[in-house]
């Protein structure tokens, strides 16, 4: 039997190697950073990491990465004048059913995460109550994609809606929704309609539609094709207040990613992802933005026909400028994370924090929902894109085999974004991002 070194020893060995490498390659930190690092090295404050029971802590993930692979040491000399990157993928949010390759289903834990999101659910409830107004009994409501809990259908019924139709394509979720409606005593108000919304009919027109069919890239659950078809259910489909949300957006920004700096070839080959994005909890600080976010997708539900061509093929050419202030702040934040483990020295933590914060992995995306004129739901903070709790995820395609390192601030990141949104809800949206960094 070969004796394995302790995990602590492996971490120390790898981090020490990074420190020695940086003795030759890493510029001095700014005065602001040095003061902060010095102060941090003398206190033992251990802030609690986000509590998500289905996830391991980032510190454990980093330690596992060190065991599983060798660290790729940075080299500023690797940079050239113009470095290409890119990725393309097809939307799959959830699990494909074995019985239907086009059917996207969700397990109950995903539904519970949506239901229990402390920002999402209360804001949707507030928007529904506002729209029901002073005469809710006269309102006919559609809950498109009601899920196993018939959550928003029940909100409308409990607040006095005269009639609610709740469409659900997943047979198992539809049956669960019927059970919840029956147990709640609203079976005379709520009718569960099983099937794809594009393939069912309603006996009457509705006053407004609640459609929480928004992916972590806003369009990836087929919102474009679904809402376009759903116009036939509405009395006045071109009125903005006929829809909750009334528009959905996707924001994006270039990012650095900690594990991309720890995992590297040949032990770990990022190209095997074949463009498929990594998805992050929006509170995960292993992913840091390198510039301010920009709007890359904007789908107006009421106006979906008049601007359909623009929305179906959302092609944009973007230019991001790497923000030195963000890099410096990211370095400090990452250093703070690495120093949570007292066994790593200031020098070791400084080296890995610098390497990660000054690198580029890809273009991250996340959704924003405009529910009403005065209610907006953000998965990351707006407009800065900072971390916050959300059941939606931040989507990051790994766009290079190794991180592009040596960023100093003010580099131009030029990106061509192409979102292809099919007319048929049974065909998955496709996404492509490619560009160059001008060093």
How should these model regions be labeled?
Residues 47-67:
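N-terminal secretory signal peptides and thylakoid transit peptides that target proteins
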Residues 60-80:
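N-terminal export signals
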Residues 20, 72-76, 371:
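Hydrophobic membrane-targeting signal helices
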Residues 9-10, 46-51, 106-110:
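General secondary-structure propensity
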Residues 1-34, 39-47:
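N-terminal chloroplast transit peptides
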Residues 83-144, 149-418, 422-438:
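Class I SAM-binding transferase module
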Residues 21-25, 77-82:
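Boundary at the C-terminal end of the N-terminal hydrophobic targeting segment
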């Amino acid at each position: 039997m070969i004796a394995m070194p302790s995990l602590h020893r492996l971490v120390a060995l790898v981090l020490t190697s990074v420190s020695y490498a940086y003795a030759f390659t890493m510029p001095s930190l700014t005065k602001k950073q040095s003061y902060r690092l010095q102060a941090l090295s003398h206190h033992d404050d251990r802030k609690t990491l986000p509590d998500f029971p289905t996830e391991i802590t980032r510190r454990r993930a980093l330690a596992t990465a060190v065991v599983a692979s060798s660290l790729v040491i940075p080299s500023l000399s690797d940079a050239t004048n113009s470095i290409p990157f890119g990725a393309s993928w097809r939307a799959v949010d959830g699990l494909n059913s074995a019985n239907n390759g086009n059917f996207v289903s969700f397990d109950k834990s995903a539904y519970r995460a949506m239901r229990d999101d402390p920002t999402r659910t209360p804001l949707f409830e507030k928007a529904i109550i506002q729209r029901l107004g002073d005469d809710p009994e006269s309102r006919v409501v559609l809950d498109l994609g009601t899920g196993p809990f018939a959550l928003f259908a029940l909100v409308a019924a409990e607040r006095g809606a005269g009639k609610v139709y709740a469409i659900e394509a997943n047979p198992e979720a539809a049956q669960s929704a019927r059970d919840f409606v029956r147990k709640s005593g609203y079976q005379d108000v709520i009718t569960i309609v099983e099937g794809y919304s594009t393939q069912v009919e309603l006996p009457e027109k509705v006053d407004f539609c609640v459609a929480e069919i928004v992916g972590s890239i806003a369009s990836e659950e087929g919102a474009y094709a679904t809402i376009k078809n759903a116009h036939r259910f509405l009395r006045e489909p071109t009125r903005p207040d006929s829809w909750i949300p009334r528009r959905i957006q996707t924001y994006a920004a270039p990012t650095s990613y900690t594990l991309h700096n720890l995992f590297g070839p040949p032990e770990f080959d990022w190209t095997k992802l074949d463009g498929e994005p990594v998805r992050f909890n929006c509170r995960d600080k292993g992913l840091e933005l390198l510039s301010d976010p920009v709007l890359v997708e904007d789908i107006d539900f009421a106006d979906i026909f008049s601007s359909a061509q623009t929305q179906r093929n959302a092609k944009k050419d973007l230019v991001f400028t790497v923000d030195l202030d963000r890099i410096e702040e990211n370095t400090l934040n990452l250093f703070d994370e690495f120093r949570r483990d007292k066994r790593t020295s200031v020098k070791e933590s400084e080296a890995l924090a610098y390497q990660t914060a000054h690198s580029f992995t890809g273009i991250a995306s996340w959704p924003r929902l405009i529910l009403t004129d005065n209610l907006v739901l953000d998965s990351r903070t707006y407009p800065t894109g900072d971390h916050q709790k959300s059941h939606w995820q931040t989507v990051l395609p790994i766009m290079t085999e190794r991180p592009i390192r040596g960023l100093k601030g003010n580099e131009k990141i030029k990106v061509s974004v192409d979102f292809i949104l099919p007319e048929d809800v049974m065909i998955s949206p496709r996404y492509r991002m490619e560009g160059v960094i001008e060093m």
